[in-house]
Structures are given as C-alpha cells and as structure tokens.
C-alpha cells in the first residue's frame, strides 16, 4: 500500500542531531517537519549511554543519555514534529520526494 505524506522538512534519523534539527526547523518556520527513524524509539545512541555527563552545555545540568534524549524528544513533541518509527528511507528523488518503507507498507 502506498501513502503520500507532505512535509516542508524531512529528517532521516532520530538521533541527537536529527532531534535537534527537527526542533530547529520548526523554530525557523517550517510548518510540517517529519523525522524518519529506523528504530522503534527516538534518541539514537543516547538511549544506550546510561552514564551521566550529558546536558551540561545545553540544559545546564548533568543528565544521562536517555534523559538528555528525552528532553529533546519532549521539546520536539511541543513543536508538533511528526515521526515515522520502524521506517527506512529507500530513495530520495531530485524533486524532494522520498520512498520510505516500514514493516507494513511503502510511504
């Protein structure tokens, strides 16, 4: 089954950089931002970094990796960023379209 999703900005990967990019895109005026993540949760490698030491510069407090990712995930949700989990980008076309596959369909 094929679906069409329109967005102003599509970000591939919901690791730290992807989450920050999604938030920045919304703050800069992008109306619809979509993050495509191949895993079943947001946060990327930070979900595995259970030791403290993150967040000192940005949040001014010491956080574990999952706590740090959680702050960005919360902020991303506050800015109404859309996500596709368990999905992989298969192709990006010159006109800005992309083909994304999840476990059930191709978008």
Could you say what each language-model-derived stretch is?
Residues 17, 28, 64-105:
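Feature captures the FAD/FMN-dependent oxidoreductase FAD-binding
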Residues 1-8, 103-105:
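A short, basic/flexible loop-to-alpha-helix module at the beginning of a structural domain
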Residues 7-71, 75:
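Beta1-alpha1 glycine-rich phosphate/pyrophosphate-binding loop at the start
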